[in-house]
């Protein structure tokens, strides 16, 4: 990554409440193979979703402060709850660029929808913050947003990583082997059937853990979404 026309070899900081942000880190490595990363998975305080947003904001500032002390040149908050709770505060408080994951997801949903009916699944804190609904409507006020808190998906994703044998390098393979289980499908149906009945044609996975569950979610929500 170049800064003022010259390459800056400092690492990029990436953090999440646990394993989920590795899905974002993986995409950064694919897009920027020459960059080095420092990843923080705050598994000691995972999940963030049930916590008060002010508490999560405190976690965000603490982790950003540590990453800045390590000499990172920018920070990616690879957690939707943390983005909703602390991105704006962190951007004002630190000199390095800090980006989150809500706005890119909202823009992708606006561009993808054909019928203007978008579903959002995320943690309780992210849904209650209104971050995605507000971001989507800011881009296109004509879109109807249906939001559902799906906190048990984080638990399933974290359990699946721990159940996997060997290094987790192929998330698609992991999803098909670990997450397609009857008990998990029942939970997914309880969460997703109401959204499907709302007629959505686009679903935002508003938590970085959720791409691990794409096969499970896709099997329930249907190919038309």
Model-identified regions with their sequence ranges:
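Non-catalytic structural scaffold of enzyme domains
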Residues: 1-225
């Amino acid at each position: 990554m170049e800064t003022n026309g010259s390459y800056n070899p400092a690492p990029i900081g990436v953090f999440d409440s646990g394993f989920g942000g590795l899905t974002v880190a993986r995409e950064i490595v694919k897009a920027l193979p020459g960059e080095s990363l420092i990843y923080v998975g705050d598994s000691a305080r995972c999940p963030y979703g049930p916590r008060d947003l002010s508490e999560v904001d405190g976690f965000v500032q603490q982790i950003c402060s540590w990453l800045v002390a390590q000499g990172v040149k920018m920070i990616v908050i690879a957690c939707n709850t943390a983005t909703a709770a602390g991105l704006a505060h962190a951007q004002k408080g630190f000199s390095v660029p800090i980006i989150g994951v809500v706005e890119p997801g909202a823009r992708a949903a606006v561009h993808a929808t054909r019928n203007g009916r978008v579903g959002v699944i995320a943690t309780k804190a992210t849904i209650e913050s209104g971050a995605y609904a507000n971001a989507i409507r800011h881009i296109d006020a004509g879109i109807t947003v249906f939001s559902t808190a799906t906190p048990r998906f984080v638990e399933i994703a974290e359990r699946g990583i721990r159940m996997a044998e060997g290094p987790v390098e192929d998330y698609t393979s992991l999803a098909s082997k670990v997450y397609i289980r009857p008990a998990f499908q029942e939970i997914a149906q309880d969460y997703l059937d109401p959204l499907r009945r709302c007629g959505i044609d686009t679903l935002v996975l508003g938590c970085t853990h959720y791409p691990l569950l794409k096969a499970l979610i896709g099997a329930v929500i249907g190919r038309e979404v």
